[in-house]
A protein has these predicted regions:
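N-terminal low-hydrophobic presequence detector
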Residues: 1, 31-32
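Intrinsically disordered, low-complexity regulatory regions enriched in serine/threonine/proline
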Residues: 2-9, 13-20, 25-27, 51-53, ...
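Ser/Thr-rich, low-complexity intrinsically disordered terminal regions
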Residues: 26, 33-69
Length: 114
């Protein structure tokens, strides 16, 4: 899995969060779509949510899942203005955790037990 974030701010916590989750087994296409994933590009399920950011540019959080293998391809925080990874501060991290928690509640993701 690729993780896209600028290496400052809360980047380490964001990476730890990404590494602590995985897809639940046997998720149907319908479940992905009900949880907010799209597949306009047929081989990929794509989850994207805008984040409220103090910068004047829009920032998004996204997860890409390969439809055939049901594996997470990438997770990232993207500056939509420049289409580049963005840094994660406390506010963004809280919003990302909220989105991840909702996907856990939907049964799409689960936390890896250590």
């Amino acid at each position: 899995m690729n993780i896209y974030v600028l290496p400052r701010g809360k980047a380490d916590e964001f990476k730890s969060l990404c590494e602590s989750i995985r897809l639940r087994p046997n998720i149907t296409d319908k479940q992905f779509k009900e949880a907010g994933f799209t597949n306009y590009y047929e081989p990929i399920f794509y989850f994207c949510k805008g984040l409220a950011c103090e910068d004047k540019y829009p920032v998004s959080f996204d997860i890409q899942v390969v439809k055939k293998t049901r594996k997470i391809k990438s997770i990232g925080v993207l500056d939509e203005q420049f289409l580049q990874p963005h840094y994660v501060d406390e506010s963004l991290l809280d919003q990302i955790k909220s989105h991840v928690h909702k996907l856990v509640e939907y049964g799409i993701l689960e936390y890896i037990k250590e």
